[in-house]
């Protein structure tokens, strides 16, 4: 009963809560946004920062959560061997790093669901850049915490594509700029950038189109919200999935390495995808 009182008070105040959970000897910190009037068993969305980043409260999901009534968990990555906060996705310079972020994020999800009375069934994962790579790794992994993933400027590392076999279909939505020079749209199979070899974005997404057995592609072109940057967005939606798991790819033509909030309502678009799987 005491937990219910605390959560109700927090929700009414519409504020960020700072919390932490010890996993494998590491204290894993996170902030949690609970919008005003949030209901028990509300959906939960995780947002993961990029390489070298920190808990980012001003991320694209928070304003959408404020309007739509879901919670946003924003975890902090641990420092890798280079001393940079990150998620362990198997970059070459992370070799030997024993942190298991698939396990850690799954444990945090279970803790947050129970502690703050949020939905165990309707928990989703999104993230930017290194956080996007973590979304792909989670999709490939044998995990039950996250129902769908939405990487932003994320990549599938060649080692994932080569060595892992997804144990089950999962809905996936990628947003990526064609002029991204950090996470190249065309991939980097020779590891020229030093992040490790990674797949071209269309091929990486195509794996999930095949895995999810999507049989139809719908394509729509929309202009950027910023009428002066010359960008436009091609929305590829792969539907009619025999597994019930659609795949979306938003190709931001001219877009660079960003969350693309100048080009589209990123948080709203991601939530519109996740919301299809809320039960």
Predicted regions and their residues:
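Short substrate-entry loop that stabilizes the transition state in hydrolases
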Residues: 38-83, 146, 158-159, 182-184, ...
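Bacterial Sec-dependent N-terminal signal peptides
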Residues: 1-15
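Accessory cap/linker subdomain of secreted extracellular hydrolases
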Residues: 178-219
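Short, proline-enriched alpha-helix->beta-strand connector loops that line the catalytic pocket
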Residues: 167-172, 243-247
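Short beta-strand/loop motif that positions the catalytic acidic residue
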Residues: 174-176
């Amino acid at each position: 009963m005491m937990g219910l009182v605390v959560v109700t008070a927090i929700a009414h105040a519409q504020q960020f809560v700072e919390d932490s959970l010890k996993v494998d000897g590491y204290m894993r910190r996170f902030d949690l946004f609970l919008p005003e009037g949030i209901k028990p068993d509300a959906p939960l969305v995780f947002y993961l920062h990029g390489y070298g980043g920190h808990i980012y409260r001003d991320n694209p999901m928070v304003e959408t959560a404020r309007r739509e009534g879901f919670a946003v968990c924003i975890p902090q990555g641990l420092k890798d061997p280079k001393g940079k906060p990150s998620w362990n996705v198997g970059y070459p310079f992370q070799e030997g790093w024993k942190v298991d972020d698939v396990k850690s994020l799954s444990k945090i999800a279970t803790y947050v669901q129970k502690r703050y009375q949020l939905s165990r069934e309707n928990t989703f994962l999104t993230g930017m850049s290194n956080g996007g790579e973590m979304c792909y790794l989670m999709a490939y992994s044998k995990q039950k915490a996250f129902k769908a993933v939405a990487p932003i400027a994320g990549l599938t590392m060649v080692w994932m594509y080569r060595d892992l076999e997804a144990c089950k279909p999962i809905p996936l939505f990628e947003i990526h700029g064609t002029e991204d020079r950090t996470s190249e749209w065309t991939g980097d199979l020779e590891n020229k950038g030093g992040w490790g070899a990674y797949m071209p974005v269309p091929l990486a997404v195509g794996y999930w189109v095949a895995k999810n057995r999507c049989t139809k592609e719908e394509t729509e072109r929309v202009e950027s919200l910023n009428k002066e940057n010359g960008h436009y967005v091609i929305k590829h939606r792969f539907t009619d999935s025999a597994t019930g798991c659609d795949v979306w790819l938003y190709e931001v033509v001219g877009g660079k390495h960003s969350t693309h909030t100048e080009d589209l309502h990123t948080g709203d678009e991601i939530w519109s995808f996740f919301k299809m799987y809320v039960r």
